[in-house]
Every structure is written in C-alpha cells, then in structure tokens.
Amino acid sequence: MNNWNSITIKISREAEETISALLIEAGSAGVEINDSADYLNHEDQFGEVLPEIEQSELVEITAYYPENMPIVELKAEIEHKIANLADYFSLTGLSVTTNNLSETNWAEAWKKYFEPARITHDLTIVPSWTKDYLATGSEKLIRLDPGMAFGTGTHPTTKMSLYALEQVLRGGETLLDVGTGSGVLSVAATYLGAAEIFAYDIDEVAVRVALENIELNPGHEKIHVSANNLLEGIDKKADVIVANILADILVLMTDDAFRLVKEEGYLIMSGIIADKADMVIASAENAGFFLETRMIQGEWNCLIFKKTENREGVIGG
C-alpha cells in the first residue's frame, strides 16, 4: 500500500484558486478544499448531520503528494511562494501544515466533502456511495468514486471541460480522453452522444479507478481504457480529443493531437492556469489548430481548438 504526504494551507478565501493552482503546479496528486461557507450555505437534501461551525474568512486547502517527494523542502518552497503573494492577498491567519496518511485513509477522506453536484444543465456528478439520489427531468447522473485518481469532477477545469464537450459533441463521434483520471469526461461523453471513446492515462492507479467508475455508469461498453503516455504511439483518428491536465504537459501533445484529429474536428484543452494560456495557444496554433473558444473561470482557462481550413468565426480568423 502506498503512503502519501499532505500539505494543508489555511488562507483567506480570496486566495483559494491561486493557492490551488500553486499546489497543483508543485506536483500535487489532488486538492481538496474545506470552506465553512459551504456548510453554512448547504441545504440538507441528503439527511446528513452537519457539524456546528462558525463562518470564517479562511479556507483550508489540502494537497496530496507521493511519499517519495521531499515534503520538508516542498513545504518550504510553497511557503516562500505564498509569501510573495502578500501584495495580492491577505496572509492574516495563514498556516501551513503537513501530514502523512495511507492510501486507504486518503480515499476515505474524499468522502467527507464529496456530495452530488449539478455541473451543467443536464449533468450531475453523484458519489457512488450516495444510493438515494435520483435523476429528475433531463438530468443525467455520472456516478463516481474518485478513489486515488485525484478528482471528483467538480473542479473548475473539469466543469469547463464538460461545458466544452456539450458544445462540440453532436452524436456519433469518436473521442480520445487524454489523462482520463477518474474517467468523468469519458462517462459524460457517452451521455452526450459519443459513439466510441478511448481513454488514456499514464498512471496505472488512475486507469484502474477510471475502469471502476466507468462500470458504475450506463454506456460503459463504449469506453476503452488503457495506460499510455499522452498520445504517443496512438493511431486512432478522432473527431474530438479532450485533455484536462497541466499546461506544461498539454504542449507536449499538440502535434500528435493535430495528427489524430479529423478535419473539422476539435481539440479541447483544460487545466491551464492563466499565465500559461498563451503558451498553450501558441503550441496548438503552431501545430495547425485554430482557437475557436476560450473559457475562463477564476485562474483557469479551457480552450477549444478546431482543425479546419475555414477560419470564419474562429478567434483571430
């Protein structure tokens, strides 16, 4: 069984997205946010008993790192970077602490904060252990257990990826999901009409968890999951490629993506912090794509590129 180190930062709520991005850029294998406002604004829909808690201007952001990463040095580096943010955010009440936990404890820790969440008009992400939540109207339920795949599907980068899939999928497409993680985007693609989906992740744990999550949902027979490094060695042509991973990794796959996307097809890239968006755009455009849509939520960007000779309606076209 693997052990993991965590770094928990208590900081002003306004710094939440910036600190989350900083922790992910530092190599975090997952981030969870504990905000008292979420409890105070929560409607008791599922019969749970919530703790008594007072409103605070602070949030707790916990990031997870493999045990073999030098946690003492990493903590010092993160503290230094946070200190440089003093001109932008209040550091009153700041604390940075570390902890060690087992794989089992981490997997269970997610469950305290993971509740059903309506992500788009039609898509709701539901924890696999919440059995009494039923769909209403056009609502489609994505049942998910994040396990060790580092994502519950509610992060802004995933939300924007889902919005992007809603925009480009019309039915019958072949889709490649690069860095599938929990498998949430692949499951969503089945609901949105994709005919065939190939999901890849370099992390064997993520591959296992994605397979388990996919089996929880209808349409799982359309999804094929395997371990792979980005799109290396892949020759499957696709109408849509989606990747929600770090910007520095995205730029490594733009040439392969252009090779594999069919004419008039789309490349969706998310997981991009604001100051690296131009780098990703340049990489995709140099490969031959045109930027069609740019979505921004807080510090995060999601980009929709198109492979087309017709530049009408394309940003910069």
From Swiss-Prot:
Its EC number is 2.1.1.-. It catalyses: L-lysyl-[protein] + 3 S-adenosyl-L-methionine = N(6),N(6),N(6)-trimethyl-L-lysyl-[protein] + 3 S-adenosyl-L-homocysteine + 3 H(+). It comes from the Bacteria. One of its GO terms (molecular function) is protein-lysine N-methyltransferase activity. It is an enzyme of class 2 (transferase). Coiled coil: none annotated. Keywords: Cytoplasm, Methyltransferase, S-adenosyl-L-methionine, Transferase. One of its GO terms (biological process) is methylation. S-adenosyl-L-methionine binds at T158, G179, D201, N244. InterPro entries: Ribosomal_L11_MeTrfase_PrmA, Ribosomal_PrmA_MeTrfase, SAM-dependent_MTases_sf. GO terms for cellular component: cytoplasm. CDD domains: AdoMet_MTases. It is found in: Cytoplasm. Pfam families: PrmA. Belongs to the methyltransferase superfamily. PrmA family. PANTHER family: ELECTRON TRANSFER FLAVOPROTEIN BETA SUBUNIT LYSINE METHYLTRANSFERASE. Methylates ribosomal protein L11. This is Ribosomal protein L11 methyltransferase.
